[in-house]
Each structure stands twice: as C-alpha cells, then as structure tokens.
C-alpha cells in the first residue's frame, strides 16, 4: 500500500495536467455547442457528401448538429485519444523507470518481494486510469450543466465504460512493454496508441482491412457506434479484457525472471 501511495503521489501532477486538459477541452466544446449549432447544421450537409471520411468519423450515423451527435463524434474522439495516450504513458513508465533511474536496488531493500512490487505497480496504473476518468467525466458533466443539456444517461455510461476498458487494455499492454524494457518507452507507447486509432479509421474505410476491428480497442469503444446504437459490442469488450489479463500475466512472468539493473 505504501508503494501505491508513493506512485499516486509521484504521478499526481501528471494526472491533474492530463485530466484538466482533456476534461477541460471536452467541457469547453460542450459549452461552445450552442453558439456553433447553426454552423454545425451547414457542416452536417457538407459532411454527408464526403463518403468514406464521414464513415470513418461516424458522421454517417450521427448528426453533429445535435448535442448527442456532436458529443458522439467530435468530443468522443478527443476523449478517446486523450485517455488512450494517458493510459499508454502511465503503463509505459511504471516498471522501467526503476531500471532507468537506477532505483531497483532501493526497492530490493524494502520488505517486499517482486510479486508484491509488481502487484502494487499495476494497481497504481489501474487506479491512475480510474482517477483520470473520474476527473474528466466530472468536468464533462460540469460542461453539460453549464450548457443546460444532458445526454441519455444509459448511453453516456455505456460509452465511458467502454472507454475505461479500452484504456485499461492499452495501459496493460504498455505495462508489459515496460516490463520488457530497461528504459521508459513512452514515445513508442504513445505511437502504439495512435496506431490503434489509425487502425480503427482504416478498417472503417477500406473493406480489405475490416479485420483490424478485431485488433483495435477503439472499434468497440467508438463513440459514434455506441451513441447511434445505444449498446456496446460486448464480445469485443470481453476480448479486450482477455488481452488485458494476458498482458498482465506475461508482464508478471517477465518481471519475475528479469535481471533487474540496479
């Protein structure tokens, strides 16, 4: 528990910056929607003629001239990218920073085995992702309160639940990368999160690449799909949870056998 508290304290500044940036941007866009509503109606007509581009961004399912459509396409995209990048960055640094910073020897002096250190490190990743989501969603709700509008509660919860699963999957895979590396691979993990997003776009636009939807967690957590259908593809969400568990198990095996640099 002491190690968990230490990690939360060390990452407090980072999580505040990310949560306020992502949540504040989303809330600000919600507050701006009323003033942009008329121009959004004109943009809806323009986007409807853009074929594959509209399909990639979900504008063939939702109208951005409505609050639900605007949130499900524009704001959901900002939240998804911001959340995945935060999860990737958090997972990427959690284990490897000890080797890079030559603090493994200090950890070895604590009355904790590798198994407990690993457990509390991963618990810190999960808790940081949960705190990020809590803070950003609170800011988003403040935005809705200020705008005097609110989306369907069930769909809103489904979307953010799917996003949480997506972020935990990305964070867990990057946690595995952290276990494999002696240095923080933050750049590579941020790039990995972006590649997953690009894969989601490509599988929606290029029929031959449709199989990528089974690879990228952005597909089942896509805001436009969830707000248009009112449901989550739970089969894919369950597969994401399996990938998450396998990543953590693999990371544990690697970490237990690893020759840690002091």
Where are the regions that the model predicts?
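Aromatic- and glycine-rich beta-strand/loop motifs that create alpha-glucan
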Residues: 1-22
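Terminal transmembrane helical anchor/hairpin motif
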Residues: 11-14, 28-68, 188-262
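Secretory targeting signals
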Residues: 23, 30-31, 68-76, 119-175, ...
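Long, hydrophobic alpha-helical segments
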Residues: 71-96
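Hydrophobic/aromatic residues in alpha-helical transmembrane segments
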Residues: 87-91, 139, 172-173, 217, ...
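Transmembrane helix boundary and interhelical loop/hinge segments in multi-pass membrane proteins
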Residues: 88-108, 122
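Alpha-helix N-cap/start motif
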Residues: 114-115
């Amino acid at each position: 528990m002491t190690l968990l508290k230490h990690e939360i304290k060390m990452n407090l500044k980072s999580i505040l910056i990310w949560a306020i940036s992502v949540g504040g941007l989303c809330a600000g866009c919600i507050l701006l929607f009323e003033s942009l509503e008329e121009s959004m109606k004109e943009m809806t007509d323009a986007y409807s003629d853009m074929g594959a581009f509209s399909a990639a961004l979900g504008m063939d399912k939702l109208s951005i001239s409505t609050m639900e459509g605007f949130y499900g396409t524009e704001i959901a995209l900002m939240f998804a990218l911001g959340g995945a990048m935060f999860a990737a960055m958090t997972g990427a640094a959690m284990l490897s920073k000890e080797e890079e910073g030559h603090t493994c020897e200090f950890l070895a002096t604590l009355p904790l085995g590798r198994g407990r250190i690993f457990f509390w490190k991963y618990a810190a990743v999960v808790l940081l992702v949960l705190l990020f989501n809590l803070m950003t969603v609170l800011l988003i709700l403040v935005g809705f309160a200020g705008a005097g509008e609110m989306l369907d509660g069930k769909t809103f919860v489904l979307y953010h639940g799917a996003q949480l699963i997506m972020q935990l999957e990305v964070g867990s895979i990057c946690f595995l990368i952290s276990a494999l590396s002696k240095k923080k691979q933050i750049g590579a993990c941020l790039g990995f999160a972006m590649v997953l997003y690009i894969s989601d776009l490509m599988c929606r636009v290029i029929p031959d690449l449709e199989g990528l939807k089974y690879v990228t967690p952005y597909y089942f957590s896509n805001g436009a799909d969830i707000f248009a259908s009112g449901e989550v593809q739970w089969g894919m969400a369950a597969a994401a949870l399996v990938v998450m568990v396998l990543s953590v198990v693999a990371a544990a095996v690697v970490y237990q056998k690893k020759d840690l640099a002091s």
